[in-house]
Amino acid sequence: MWQTASVGDLRLGIVHGDAQSLAGWGFAQEHLTDAAHRDQARAWFEQAGVDAFACSHTRLPVYQRLRRADGQGQAWVLNNGAAGMPNFQGDSAGLLTRIATTPLAGSNSRASVVHRTVHIDAVAITLCPAQLQQRFVAQWPPGSDAHASYFSRIAAGPDYHAGQVVRFETEAVLAAAAL
């Protein structure tokens, strides 16, 4: 369940959720802390024949580097978290993932990695906090399940910081130990 594209020398799988489901959470940052789950992700990379999966949907961003199943090279999960909601505490911006053969010009990258010749950035999407909150409350007033689940995130951002986005496999092991 993916679309493929090539950007420079990067073969990319594009999904909404994960490699198995449109609504999947297999590329969520909290699942990537589990070694057995990273093995499953490695299998998805081999099945798709890609170097990276770009995804969204899982609320918190993570750019997770994994060793390939054959031990030769690396693969990346490039998860932007949420385009339409804050991703970091105290930062009202949404995020999109830019994957390009040239570096990003400007200062609106919240996290970045380079894979061979390809530049990957979590680019901030400027949102007006007051307008976002007003539109949200008009759609999902206090007392609704959505308000209970998301309003505090929209108002202040989640308890997550830009320094937590880029992770290498050894860091995923340490993050799991901290849970």
Question: What are these model-derived regions, one by one?
Answer:
Residues 39-43, 51, 56, 61, ...:
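Internal, well-ordered alpha-helical scaffold/interface segments
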Residues 20-22, 52-66, 85-89:
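Active-site environment of divalent metal-dependent phosphoester hydrolases
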Residues 69-179:
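Acidic, His/Gly-rich catalytic cores of divalent-metal-dependent hydrolytic chemistry
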Residues 16-20, 38-39, 60, 74-75, ...:
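Generic detector of short, locally flexible boundary/turn motifs and exposed helical patches
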Residues 16, 57, 81:
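Divalent metal-coordination and catalytic microenvironments
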Residues 7-10, 47-48, 55-58, 72-73, ...:
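Short gly/pro-enriched beta-turn/loop segments at secondary-structure junctions
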Residues 2-6, 61-65, 95-98:
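Short beta-strand scaffold segments in enzyme catalytic cores
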Residues 1-52:
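Conserved catalytic scaffold of divalent metal-dependent phosphoesterases
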